[in-house]
A protein has these predicted regions:
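Peripheral, non-catalytic segments flanking oxidoreductase cores
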Residues: 1-100
C-alpha cells in the first residue's frame, strides 16, 4: 500500500511513477496501527495533543468527530469524518514531516 501511495504522490507532483522507490527500499517501519476509541460519555476532553506526524504519511479512518487540523491562518478547525461516493467511511491521507 505504501509503495502505491508513493507512486500516486509522485504522479500528483508531476514526477515519474516510481520516483520515490529508491528512497523507500528499507523503511524503519512498515506499518504502525493506533486506535483511539470514541467515548460518547465524555465531552470536550482532549485526546492526543497538538502534533505533526513524523512519518511520510498517515492513513486515518475517522468515523467519529474530534479530529482537528491547523489551517494556514494558524487556527484549529474541525476535520469531520468523510465518506466516499458510495456513502461508506473513507480514508484520509495526511502528509507527514518526512514527505513534506
Amino acid at each position: 500500500l505504501g509503495h502505491r501511495l508513493f507512486d500516486a504522490f509522485a504522479l500528483a507532483l508531476g514526477l515519474p511513477e516510481g520516483y520515490f522507490k529508491p528512497m523507500v527500499t528499507c523503511p524503519p517501519a512498515k506499518l504502525r496501527l493506533i486506535h483511539y476509541p470514541f467515548d460518547a460519555s465524555v465531552e470536550d476532553v482532549p485526546g492526543i495533543g497538538a502534533h505533526t506526524d513524523y512519518e511520510c504519511f498517515t492513513l486515518l479512518l475517522a468515523d467519529q468527530p474530534g479530529l482537528e487540523v491547523l489551517n494556514e491562518e494558524s487556527v484549529w478547525i474541525d476535520a469531520p469524518p468523510v465518506k466516499n461516493a458510495a456513502g461508506e467511511e473513507a480514508f484520509v491521507i495526511n502528509i507527514g514531516d518526512m514527505l513534506e
